[in-house]
Amino acid sequence: MKGGKRVQPARPNRINREIRAQEVRLTGVDGEQIGIVSLNEALEKAEEAGVDLVEISPNAEPPVCRIMDYGKFLYEKSKSTKEQKEEQKVIQVKEIKFRPGTDDGDYQVKLRNLIRFLEDGDKAKITLRFRGPEMAHQQIGMEVLNPLRKDLCEDMDLAVVESFPTKIEGRQMIMVLAPKKKQ
């Protein structure tokens, strides 16, 4: 194994003695404005409070610094970004395949799955696959897709049609449904 120094990740904010400015605009622990003070005076106030002096806005003139517990600040920041990530939902496209001769029982099962996908907030891609002599009968494909569109978009008001096929593309017809936005 190779030995070496472990590189510390760069901190986004300078703290305490890392601050280079001679004068800083200081904000207290509770967010109150203290005013423009020398760096040494700001460091003394932070030390008295038992916390860190953190450079919040280094590009301001003079730089803005706040007296705060830096460890707690980083923890709160990482916690809030983690919560934001959890709240975001990645929309997936779920696919259900039909055939022109899909029977009513299979249709109902696939319809239930489509309803579940749309209620979960995912898009649904309905692929109607043709084989052999079925290619000549596009209207049979429409007889499968139109009831689906009617059931999901008009009767249940669950989805909006993003794309609806007008003709066979290759050996299949594809309809894409997106969930309706919840108020």
UniProtKB/Swiss-Prot annotation:
Please give the InterPro entries that the UniProt record associates with this protein.
T_IF-3_C_sf, T_IF-3_N_sf, Translation_initiation_fac3_CS, Translation_initiation_fac_3, Translation_initiation_fac_3_C, Translation_initiation_fac_3_N
Tell me which UniProt keywords the record has, alphabetically.
Cytoplasm, Initiation factor, Protein biosynthesis
- Pfam families xref list: IF3_C (PF00707), IF3_N (PF05198)
Q: Does the keyword Cytoplasm apply?
A: yes
Question: Biological process GO terms, please?
Answer: ribosome disassembly
- GO cellular component annotations, sorted alphabetically? cytosol; membrane
- Compartment(s): Cytoplasm
Which residues are marked as site: Important for 30S binding?
Answer: 107, 110
A GO term for molecular function? translation initiation factor activity
Chief subcellular location: cytoplasm
- What is this protein's function per UniProt? IF-3 binds to the 30S ribosomal subunit and shifts the equilibrium between 70S ribosomes and their 50S and 30S subunits in favor of the free subunits, thus enhancing the availability of 30S subunits on which protein synthesis initiation begins.
Family statement drawn from the similarity comment of this UniProt entry: Belongs to the IF-3 family.
Recorded hits in PANTHER family, A to Z, give: TRANSLATION INITIATION FACTOR IF-3, TRANSLATION INITIATION FACTOR IF-3, MITOCHONDRIAL
Q: What's the subunit arrangement here?
A: Monomer.
Q: What is this protein called?
A: Translation initiation factor IF-3
Its source organism is Serratia marcescens
The record's gene field reads infC
